[in-house]
Amino acid sequence: GIDFMTFAYHMTPEIIITMAVTIVLFKFMFRKDLKQKAENIEKLQALDEKKEIKDSMLLKKSAIILGAVIIMFMLHGMLDLDVSIIALGGAAVLLVITGIQPFKALHHVEWPTLLFFCGLFIIVGGVEVSGALELLAHNILELTGGDLGATMFSITIVSAFASAFVDNIPFTATMIPIVESISVDPTFAQNLTAFDYNPLWYALAFGADLGGNGTLIGASANLVAIAVAERFG
């Protein structure tokens, strides 16, 4: 498996490049809206962020727990802990030390998004059992001739375009068994002997992350942001 730090090490260059390109594109696309206007400056100066903080102690406790969870994410490979356990553990500790009622916290969970992913993973599991994904993996290998570079390029391009229109998490969940099937194929596995890791996973991650920036529905974080924006107007 690939731990958090290994993934971050290999994906950081992509993040930096993507962020730089995105900033340039935003400045070009929204150049009219980004111009300074006197009324907007006055509105910003009139804002008082302290008034929005209802409980400063809760904010400090939450920040400490969030920081601890992020650090644990970085160390989970060394500690041999699953990231899901770390995340749930952080949530449990926060509930205990803040005294927030569990039902009150659960009320703010984005249940529609979670149920959507639950249903999606069930469908992906069913398609995998049917053998359709394995057949698709063999078709990809036939198309690329088993060449490592061509296979990585194909996975990256397909992932980038598909993730722009299909949320990158469900798309990645669908592609995982396909990449696994390609990796263990006898005609292709010999290409991976020179690597300490499977480069196909990074090709998939690169394409899915890149495509997730393409549209609002390209990433689950975008969907959550939209839901929160709709809730608070």
Model regions and ranges:
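Alpha-helical transmembrane segments of multipass membrane proteins
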Residues: I17-T22, F26, V69-M72, G90, ...
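Flexible hinge motifs at transmembrane-helix junctions and intramembrane kinks/re-entrant loops
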Residues: S56, K60, V69-L88, V96, ...
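Structural signal for the C-terminal ends of transmembrane alpha-helices
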Residues: F28-R31, L75, L94-Q101, V127, ...
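Juxtamembrane and boundary regions of transmembrane helices in multi-pass small-molecule transporters
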Residues: M5-K54, I64, F206, L210-G233
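Hydrophobic transmembrane alpha-helices of multi-pass, membrane-embedded glycosylation machinery
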Residues: L88-L95, I178-V179, V228
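Hydrophobic alpha-helical transmembrane segments
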Residues: A8-T12, I16, L59, A63-G67, ...
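Membrane-interfacial helix-loop connectors
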Residues: G1-T12, E110, G125-G233
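Membrane-interface junctions of multi-pass transporters
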Residues: L47-E49, H76-L79, V96-T151
